[in-house]
Amino acid sequence: MARPAAVRVLWALLLPLLLGSARGLRNASQRTFTIDYSHNRFLKDGQPFRYISGSIHYSRVPRFYWKDRLLKMKMAGLNAIQTYVPWNFHEPQPGQYQFSGEQDVEYFIKLAHELGLLVILRPGPYICAEWDMGGLPAWLLLKESIILRSSDPDYLAAVDKWLGVLLPKMKPLLYQNGGPIITMQVENEYGSYFTCDYDYLRFLQKLFHHHLGNDVLLFTTDGANEKFLQCGALQGLYATVDFGPGANITAAFQIQRKSEPKGPLVNSEFYTGWLDHWGQPHSTVRTEVVASSLHDILAHGANVNLYMFIGGTNFAYWNGANMPYQAQPTSYDYDAPLSEAGDLTEKYFALREVIRKFEKVPEGFIPPSTPKFAYGKVALKKLKTVEEALNVLCPPGPINSLYPLTFIQVKQYFGFVMYRTTLPQDCSDPTPLSSPLSGVHDRAYVSVDGVPQGVMERSNVITLNITGKAGATLDLLVENMGRVNYGRYINDFKGLISNLTLGSSILTNWMIFPLNTEDAVRSHLGGWHGPNNGRHDKTFAHRSSNYTLPAFYMGNFSIPSGIPDLPQDTFIQFPGWTKGQVWINGFNLGRYWPARGPQMTLFVPRHILVTSTPNTIMVLELEHAPCGDSGPEVCTVEFVDRPVIGAPPTPGHPPPDLSHRDLRLDYV
């Protein structure tokens, strides 16, 4: 009889544990996020819930600073954050997926969860976001006739494969599975796109449910305009709207009610500022206007996401563009409550006070703005021209083609390609080099036998007079300035996308060099000495003093010793420089263009700086450097402790009419 007694004792010990486990499972299964249609609200775990969210794009904020920015958002009174997942950020080449380091979206979402923030996820596949090609990978254009954002079989196959990788990673992070993701957006402002393909939306809806389950809350977002909701909304996807300050809030939500007669009011993008373009004024929206409008939205009982709460930076080549072609700058500051560098602003505290009137705001310490340091001027010397460095920039050598090939055709998705041919005739008198179909996408830096001739620019300068002898080498260094991210023109091919003519003759027999600038910069282009491609041993007298050959410049600087808490964030500016790209310690900070503005400084986050060895700066100046050739041997860049992103527009680039904010809508 000892055996049954032992069993009874063991059972007595195990029973509380088993009951506890059962309660835990039941509690996990009780985590729900649903819509209460009878009371026009969300329910979180069965209780009424309203989210006040802010947009942060993990792809625009260094991982080093994710926690700092998220904490500041929480302390502002937000209970959720919203983020996009840019497909091209994670799948740069077909089948090559990147989910670590800066691309670790799972870690970002888990970090938000640890800090007590819910997550509204917008995985696309198209995201807009002023991001290159709206987040769609450029390699989709390998099929030139592909119809993006539609039921095109090739497009759907790529989407199916991509979301088949991404969504299973997101499933454990759904709220009902113990994670922070409460809702997930399908596509993005689809009603603003010309295809209006309901079969495409149904395909996405089924795909999301297949990977995430049927209890996931899916939604759409469109402009507060009835025509947008006609194509953007679909039964089974909760329709929300977006609009900015100054809009008629009652009228905007009445538009939502035409698609969703019952359910919570939601503004998925309440604009705290606006985007910028090169050559136009920095966009700002007055704090009191944003605060007043937010107050009215919350007074309506609506849910809201503040787009952006922090804008961040378009590092490297990630910026997008709008039509008629205007590229966005490196800074995505957006005049948001947190600045590009994560600094607290007047707008931050004003919006926090508005939120405090409606919801409990966390008490306690708000992480301060990060300290900035002015490291001063750094001398740079000319390293090599692009032409001299071709063997390092393009180790496999050129691709030969009778007619020009696009970036896509040579599988160069970002950066630069050198196009080379010879002049078929003497051009002793200035002779027009033309792109009759405006086929230079986006800027071409033109030289003949090493003599700069000028710049051709998409939709702006399509003809350039050049001189040279028959048989002379004609070089065009073509820059991809960022793909269109909004509207019907997102199939944005780069490079020479149509033939060039010299006089009346079509130019043929091209040598095409796709440039691997990232690897070349990391190797310092092979150092100061090396072959110069065998053609130009001397500096030539330039046809125009306005231009020098595109060239790399390099310098070093050390972080001062004896000062605590260094390195610190800083900003780099380019006095006397014109336009180009800059790297620090191999990290591609992005584009500078002080000749056009409005952005004059680039944000330098401290985590890319080192204290143990000198820091290396590499600059690719495309148009005119303030040193080298006929100028001084050394030129400088300068590190300052304040940003300048709102310089006046340059002559020839008048400010736009911003009387209505969504200028993009004219080009859907």
UniProtKB/Swiss-Prot annotation:
GO terms for molecular function: beta-galactosidase activity; protein homodimerization activity. Its main location: other. It catalyses: Hydrolysis of terminal non-reducing beta-D-galactose residues in beta-D-galactosides. Gene3D superfamilies: Galactose-binding domain-like (2.60.120.260), Glycosidases (3.20.20.80). GO terms for biological process: carbohydrate metabolic process; ganglioside catabolic process; keratan sulfate proteoglycan catabolic process. Substrate binds at Y84, E130, N188, Y334. Residues 1-24 form the signal peptide. Glycans are attached at N248, N465, N499, N546, N556. The keyword Iron-sulfur does not apply. Keywords: Disulfide bond, Glycoprotein, Glycosidase, Hydrolase, Lysosome, Signal. It is an enzyme of class 3 (hydrolase). It is found in: Lysosome. It holds the Pfam family Glyco_hydro_35. GO terms for cellular component: extracellular space; Golgi apparatus; lysosome; membrane. Residues 25-29 form a propeptide. Its EC number is 3.2.1.23. The keyword Hydrolase applies. Disulfide bonds join C196-C231, C627-C635. Cleaves beta-linked terminal galactosyl residues from gangliosides, glycoproteins, and glycosaminoglycans. Homodimer. May form higher multimers. Belongs to the glycosyl hydrolase 35 family. This is Beta-galactosidase. It comes from Canis lupus familiaris.
